Curated annotation (Swiss-Prot):
GO molecular-function terms, A-Z: histidinol dehydrogenase activity; NAD binding; zinc ion binding
Keyword entries, A-Z: Amino-acid biosynthesis, Histidine biosynthesis, Metal-binding, NAD, Oxidoreductase, Zinc
Residues bound to substrate: T239, Q261, H264, H331, D364, E418, H423
Pathway: Amino-acid biosynthesis; L-histidine biosynthesis; L-histidine from 5-phospho-alpha-D-ribose 1-diphosphate: step 9/9
NCBIfam families per the UniProt record, alphabetical: hisD
Entry-linked Gene3D superfamilies: 1.20.5.1300, Nitrogenase molybdenum iron protein domain
Taxonomic source organism: Thermobifida fusca (strain YX)
Lineage, uppermost ranks: Bacteria, Bacillati, Actinomycetota, Actinomycetes, Streptosporangiales
Transmembrane segments: none
Gene name linked to the record: hisD
Entry protein name: Histidinol dehydrogenase
Binding site for NAD(+): Y129, Q193, N216
Residues binding Zn(2+): Q261, H264, D364, H423
Length: 438
């Protein structure tokens, strides 16, 4: 029987493995030109454009762009008790972790009379995007709102697509999650037009300084187009998991975790990296057993069978570490002997999950960690969403006259070396040359 997932044999191949591990191709650049007129329309026509675009793309003409307060209250009152308890626990754990990420101001005494203070200041206003479509993601509300709140952001707004099924409002579970978090500024706007609304402002929605949150290719394209007008977290691409495992790993767990990521999208990447052909065989057998029983088996089968997924055979764990560090996955699970020591050698990953009992799905919801993570290999230079994402470090410089006099001649020398004499003159106006220390 044909395996649901391909094998990639890198044994004996020390070359850069990235060419052998293709990712799904998402052409954000060409999408930018398609969202440009949408963003310009929102810029110039505001709410009128947003209502028309909602009808065009979401199949419903929302009666209100801003969700009324009573709709938030109604959604919370109607939330399933089990889901509410789970969301409250996810919020509680996320607050524990993100509260501990807060930065404190530090003052460094460079010389007597000369200090530099690093002051951490939250972004003034943030727009948080929560996608609709194939699935409902109240967890994305938690993961975006909690770090912003813990950073001290004074003004938060959430946007999520209007749903015809719910009378032009976002999904009630999204609204309930907002209510649980105390967010009362919510907009029934989706896609690129939501990012444009945040960037330019429209109606009751004042412009924001920063936009975070996942979305489809059109959301990513709008973020790219408007970056500079707004700060962004990232251009989220298809989700991905890599699992570094040896023959001590439980194949049923490995298969279940590969499937859980493939469940997201047909272009989701599920990659197992292992030196054990025996484990590879057992995982393939588990996939053959588990996939047919999955609710979204067609989507999962496409994702596992796509070129972005595979079982990668390597020489040993050291080689496997080279592979995963080059791949820089969004999520990395380590299921090996001495997994903590192996995980400590990983340099490039959005988040790392260690051992048999730390599946990615735990991190998606209730580990306390954040699930907004870098995709597409950008974990080589970028981090996941955190309190730090919403803070700016401002250097505050304070020197007295004596401290300036001590270094004035160096400032003047460097200014003259760079042919910027007015820079030096700004110092000599305060400290005449004869008073500058040589």
């Amino acid at each position: 029987m044909r395996s649901v997932i391909s094998r990639i044999d890198l044994r004996g191949n020390p070359a850069d493995p990235r060419a052998s591990l293709p990712r799904a191709e998402i052409d954000v650049a060409s999408a930018v030109e398609k969202v440009r007129p949408i963003c310009e329309d929102v810029r110039h026509r505001g709410v009128e454009a947003l209502i028309e675009l909602g009808e065009r793309f979401d199949g419903v003409r929302p009666a209100h762009i801003r969700v009324p307060a009573d709709a938030l209250e109604t959604a919370l009152a109607g939330l399933d008790r089990t889901v509410r308890a789970a969301l409250e626990e996810a919020i509680r754990r996320a607050r524990i972790v993100h509260r501990d990420q807060r930065r404190t101001d530090t003052t460094t005494r460079v010389v007597p009379g000369g200090t530099v203070t690093e002051r951490w200041v939250p972004v003034d206003r943030v727009g948080l995007y929560v996608p609709g479509g194939r699935a409902v993601y109240p967890s994305s509300v938690v993961m975006n709102v909690v770090p912003a709140q813990e950073a001290g952001v004074p003004s938060l707004a959430v946007a999520s697509p209007p749903q015809a099924e719910f009378g032009g409002l976002p999904h009630p579970t999204i609204l309930a999650a907002c209510a649980l978090l105390g967010v009362d500024e919510v907009y029934a706007v989706g896609g690129a037009q939501a990012i444009a609304m945040f960037a330019y402002g429209a109606g009751e929605c004042a412009p924001v300084s920063m936009v975070t949150g996942p979305g489809n290719i059109w959301v990513a394209a709008a973020k790219r187009l408007l970056k500079g007008i707004i700060g962004i977290d990232s251009e989220a691409g298809p989700t991905e998991i890599a699992i570094l495992a040896d023959d001590t790993a439980n194949p049923a767990y490995v298969a279940a975790d590969l499937i859980s990521q493939a469940e997201h999208d047909v272009v989701a990447a599920s990659v197992l990296v292992t030196p054990s052909t025996a484990l590879a065989d057992r995982v393939e057998a588990e996939l053959a057993r588990q996939v047919p029983a999955a609710k979204h088996r067609e989507r999962i089968t496409q994702a596992l069978g796509g070129p972005q997924s595979g079982i990668v055979l390597v020489d040993d764990i050291d080689h496997g570490l080279d592979v995963v560090n080059a791949y820089a996955p969004e999520h990395l699970e380590v299921m090996t002997a001495d997994a903590q020591s192996v995980a400590a050698r990983v340099r490039n990953a959005g988040a790392i999950f260690i051992g048999d009992h730390s599946p990615v799905s735990l991190g998606d919801y209730c580990a306390g960690s954040n699930h907004v993570l870098p995709t597409g290999g950008v974990a080589v230079h970028s981090s996941g969403l955190s309190v730090q994402s919403f803070l700016r470090g401002i250097h505050v410089v304070e020197y007295d006259r004596a401290a300036l006099a001590e270094v004035a001649h160096h400032v003047v020398a460097l200014a003259e070396a760079e042919d910027l004499p007015a820079h030096g003159a700004a110092v000599t106006a305060r400290i005449p040359r004869e008073e500058q220390q040589a």
